A protein has these predicted regions:
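Structured, amphipathic secondary-structure segments that form assembly/contact surfaces
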Residues: 105-215
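Bacterial signal peptide processing site
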Residues: 25-28
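Cys/His-rich zinc-coordinating "finger/knuckle" motifs
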Residues: 31
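C-terminal motif of bacterial Sec signal peptides marking the signal peptidase cleavage site
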Residues: 20-23
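Bacterial N-terminal signal peptides that target proteins for export
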Residues: 1-13
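Core segments of small alpha/beta cavity-forming domains
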Residues: 62-135
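Post-signal peptide N-terminal segment of mature Sec-exported envelope proteins
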Residues: 34-60
Length: 215
């Protein structure tokens, strides 16, 4: 399951900072402050008012075969916004591998969790398997998730690691099985730029990876 590294760790950290600065506007705009924090107001009517309940979004049902075990370790946060990022980031990755296994680069489930630009990148990744008649099987742990939220909490950077040491590809036509080449680091670091859409779904805008970047 070896994949080409796309960038370096230093570049990833720079990209994360740039993402969050852009989302915050790079300044201290009053619109980003907590409402009422310096107004001195404690009006019951103000505190009682609540924004309308967010509409329930029907998310796609994503199924993976038992032959491919994609597990997520410590995928929880006490912060509800961070947890929402983790939840949708998890489903985005599951949808990608489901698309590979189903030989479907145009996966609607993956498109649901991607922006238009993000889905274009996802399709290239999926086709790097499907164009070669490859599917995946085995075990792929996903671990060490970290979420960095923009000040306005409408953009985020999600990073995590995967361990491909027990993940394999199989050629659909010949049955040939391949794992990581000898001497290849099985751990891959990922950095996903995410944005919340109008329906409240956290979508991937872009993704970068570095093999061996988890140590």
């Amino acid at each position: 399951m070896a994949r080409r590294a796309l960038t370096t760790t230093a570049a990833m950290l720079t990209a994360t900072a740039a993402l969050l600065l852009t989302a915050c506007g790079g300044g201290d705009s009053p619109s980003d402050d907590i409402k009422g924090a310096d107004s001195g107001s404690s009006s019951p009517s103000a505190s009682a008012s609540a924004s309308p309940a967010a509409p329930v979004v029907k998310r796609p049902v994503i199924k993976l075969p038992s032959s491919f075990q994609l597990t997520f370790e410590n995928w929880t946060s006490s912060d509800p916004v961070e947890q929402a990022v983790l939840n949708d980031g998890k489903e985005q990755l599951r949808a990608g591998y489901a698309a590979i296994i189903e030989n479907d680069p145009d996966s609607k489930a993956r498109a649901f969790y991607d922006t238009e630009a993000g889905f274009s990148q996802s399709q290239q990744w999926i086709k790097s398997y499907t164009d070669k008649n490859l599917t995946v099987f085995g075990k792929l742990p996903v671990y060490d998730p970290k979420v960095s939220l923009a000040k306005n909490k409408a953009a985020a950077a999600l990073s995590y690691c995967t361990d491909e040491s027990k993940g394999y590809t199989r050629n659909r036509k010949t049955g040939e099985v391949k794992g990581n080449p000898a001497g290849t680091d099985p751990e891959v670091f990922y950095l996903i730029s995410m944005a919340k859409n109008a329906q409240g779904v956290w979508q991937a805008v872009s993704a970068r990876s570095e093999r061996g970047g988890c140590s």
